């Protein structure tokens, strides 16, 4: 956990940075979460994938909400379903069932393909919801970056969260082939 004061000494504006350096080689696919509040818990959840290069999801909990950063394997996101299954299983235990969770990141598969995979898993079919922007999130023209949510207080999932491309941040994305996505609560 790192603390970064975006304000001044007399008017602090702290943010909390949770960072995992997963790619010690090219340094391209490291994960981070930045929060305005300090996390109550920090999580690392692995994929069940047999692929050695599969990256874990990192997450934080603030009150009854958990947030995860994910970067699935390229060429189809073979480990993305496993990551979601393991996050869901982790929170579907005594003492954690009341926690809502949101996994955000590069799933490396279209939301429709991810939904098909989620629908094929009885425990996930009605327990999760995908929130994706309508515009492409990757230079290839595909939507690969989105969120999978679980609301612990609802049996049928619906959301008040929307996703959109952060067009005002596009110029700073020179080295990335993905575009930044913003998730905001609908009013």
Language model: regions and residue ranges:
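Active-site regions of metal-assisted phosphoester/phosphodiester hydrolases
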Residues: 26-187
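N-terminal carbohydrate-binding/catalytic regions of secreted carbohydrate-active enzymes
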Residues: 1-28, 34
């Amino acid at each position: 956990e790192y603390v970064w004061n975006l304000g001044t000494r007399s008017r602090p504006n702290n943010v909390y940075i949770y960072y995992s350096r997963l790619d010690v080689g090219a340094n391209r696919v490291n994960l981070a979460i930045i929060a305005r509040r300090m996390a109550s818990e920090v999580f690392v959840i692995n994929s069940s994938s047999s692929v050695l290069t599969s990256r874990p999801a990192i997450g934080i909990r603030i009150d009854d909400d958990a947030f995860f950063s994910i970067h699935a394997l390229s060429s189809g996101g073979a480990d993305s379903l496993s990551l979601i299954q393991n996050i869901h299983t982790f929170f579907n235990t005594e003492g954690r069932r009341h926690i809502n969770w949101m996994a955000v990141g590069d799933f490396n598969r279209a939301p429709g393909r991810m939904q098909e995979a989620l629908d094929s898993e009885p425990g996930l079919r009605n327990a999760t919801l995908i929130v994706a922007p309508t515009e492409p999130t990757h230079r290839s023209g595909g939507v690969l970056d989105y969120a999978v949510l679980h609301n612990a207080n609802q049996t049928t999932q619906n959301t008040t969260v929307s996703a959109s491309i952060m067009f005002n941040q596009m110029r700073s994305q020179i080295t990335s082939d993905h575009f930044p996505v913003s998730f905001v609560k609908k009013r």
